[in-house]
Curated annotation (Swiss-Prot):
It comes from Neorickettsia sennetsu (strain ATCC VR-367 / Miyayama). The lineage of its organism: Bacteria, Pseudomonadati, Pseudomonadota, Alphaproteobacteria, Rickettsiales. It comes from the Bacteria. Keywords: Cytoplasm, Methyltransferase, S-adenosyl-L-methionine, Transferase, tRNA processing. S-adenosyl-L-methionine binds at G110, V130, G131, D132, Y133, V134, L135. This is tRNA (guanine-N(1)-)-methyltransferase. Its EC number is 2.1.1.228. It catalyses: guanosine(37) in tRNA + S-adenosyl-L-methionine = N(1)-methylguanosine(37) in tRNA + S-adenosyl-L-homocysteine + H(+).
Length: 225
């Protein structure tokens, strides 16, 4: 799988994507990353301009982004084109499967006040949000999307069960975890986890996941019902 990123700040990549299991996946060829500097396509050294109609901030130019997209598409045969935006469709765990199947995915990292809508309309660009909050740019959001997708690529995670037991696989959060020491600051590991009884351990984990979901994400419980 290949991710192609359009960004004003290419130096931030791969960043955290270059370490741990995601970084090993990159080094071992399970996925690849191409980073294209938007400033390479600047017009008179500018990539933005003042918004028509007035208002705060600057807007990224459609012609600049269009040239950047044309280059990316001709070079990498883009299958999905995505603009990271707080007003986009919310990116959830189930979104990863569709992206992984797309192979060549373009992630466009915005800056300033926004991008000229004509660029999004002309190239039929999807808008995707990683949450109901605003970031200074799309780079962190792009990294989150890439990380979430790459760990779903077969072979990247050493243990497939790790993926199957995670939060949002199904409609609940992940169960609580414990490791050594058995007792810490007067707090003990639940005895059932040390019992060796796999049926009881499985039941405990189901209940633990349900408790965590009801406490931290009651909206997921409501959606399921």
């Amino acid at each position: 799988m290949r991710f192609v990123v359009l960004t004003m700040f290419p130096e931030v990549f791969p960043g955290p994507l270059g370490v741990s299991v995601i970084g090993r996946g990159l080094a071992n060829g399970y996925w690849s990353l191409e980073v294209i500097p938007i400033r390479r396509f600047a017009v008179n050294s500018r990539v933005d301009d003042a918004p028509y109609g007035g208002g705060p901030g600057m807007v990224m130019r459609a012609d600049v982004l269009g040239e950047a997209f044309e280059y990316a598409n001709s070079t990498y045969q883009i299958k999905r084109r995505i603009f990271l935006s707080p007003r986009g469709t919310k990116f959830v765990q189930n979104s990863t499967a569709n992206l992984v199947e797309a192979d060549n995915v373009l992630l466009i990292c915005g800056r300033f006040e926004g991008v000229d809508q004509r660029f999004l309309n002309y190239y039929n660009v999807e808008e995707l949000s990683v949450g109901d909050y605003v970031l200074s740019g799309g780079e962190i959001a792009a990294m989150a999307v890439i990380d979430s997708c790459v760990r779903c690529i077969p072979g990247v995670l050493g243990n497939l069960q790790s993926l199957e037991c995670e939060s949002f696989v199904g409609s609940s959060l992940e169960y609580d975890h414990y490791t050594r020491p058995n007792s810490w600051k007067g707090l003990s590991v639940p005895e059932v986890l040390m019992s060796g009884n796999h049926r009881k351990i499985s039941e405990w984990r189901v209940n633990s996941a349900a408790t965590a979901t009801g406490r931290n994400r009651p909206d997921l419980v409501e959606e399921e019902s």
